[in-house]
Design a protein with these regions (language model features):
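Structured, acidic catalytic/metal-binding patches in enzyme active sites
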Residues: 1-173, 184, 218-234
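C-terminal soluble interaction/assembly domains
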Residues: 178-186, 190, 194-227
Length: 258
């Protein structure tokens, strides 16, 4: 085990309340190293206020944040902080891994769609009907958030659809890269670290920390990412949200430490 080392897994919600990102910025300042995800050339730094992009995914995220009356992670998290460390694949290595695995973005999307349809068939309520009703609700943003939050409850199941039996570049290979960087940071003497990655990465990440770094879970904390109360729409209050509207932070410490 790595003596006196602690690693927090900070599960990112990419579109959330501005107050959520402000709280994360406060917490992030206390780490020796904060490892973050971004498929980009090694060492890339996100400019303050986020990088502007016309990429279809970026446009989709912008549309979602406007529809839900929320904010975007890259616009508010301070990636210029000195303790931030890029810990993800480069576009070239990401593409190479997908080719070697015989993967494609569309194949992953269809696999995810199949999982979603299977889950819908299990339930009594129609997601399509719920979404239509939410779109015509007098408080559309809040109604949509509540519908979507229910879908996030089975996040691990959704991610297993992406991963497949042999893992995937999107989750498995990127996690391996993040933990490679983690090992380098620990080797350089860092003791208090965090990995800030999408929530879907965390089940696999936690297993690898326990198996490869001999760490063990010690505690968890929830931070409000989406406020699902009625009053949240009027001034975005900081009231506690139901569990499904929160982002989870898990702490792992070296075996034997408190």
């Amino acid at each position: 085990a790595h003596k006196n080392v602690s690693v927090d897994l900070v599960a990112a919600v990419h579109i959330g309340e501005k107050s959520y990102y402000e709280e994360l910025n406060k917490q992030f300042s206390g780490y020796d190293a904060l490892l973050y995800e971004l498929v980009a050339p090694e060492g890339t730094r996100v400019p303050k206020g986020g990088a502007k992009s016309d990429h279809p995914v970026s446009r989709l995220q912008t549309g979602m944040k406007n529809l839900l009356d929320l904010d975007f992670q890259l616009d508010h998290v301070d990636y210029q902080s000195e303790n931030f460390v890029h810990a993800d694949m480069s576009p070239a290595s990401f593409s190479k891994s997908m080719n070697e695995r015989g993967e494609s973005i569309w194949a992953l999307v269809f696999r995810m769609l199949g999982q979603s349809l299977a889950e819908q068939n299990k339930g009594e309520k129609s997601l399509d009907a719920e979404l239509v009703l939410a779109l015509f609700d007098k408080n559309r943003a809040l109604a949509l958030k509540r519908v979507l939050a229910e879908q996030f409850e089975d996040l691990e199941g959704m991610m297993s659809a992406f991963n497949g039996p042999d893992g995937s570049t999107l989750i498995t290979e990127r996690n391996k890269r993040a933990l490679e960087v983690l090992g380098n940071e620990i080797g350089s003497g860092k003791k208090r670290l965090a990995i800030f990655y999408g929530a879907g990465h965390m089940p696999d990440m936690a297993r690898r920390l326990m198996a490869d770094f001999k760490l063990k879970p010690s505690s968890e904390r929830w931070v409000t990412a989406w406020d699902l109360h009625e009053r949240a729409a009027k001034g975005r209050s900081k009231a506690a949200a139901p569990k499904e509207g929160k982002s989870k932070r898990e702490k792992a410490t070296a075996a034997g430490n408190s």
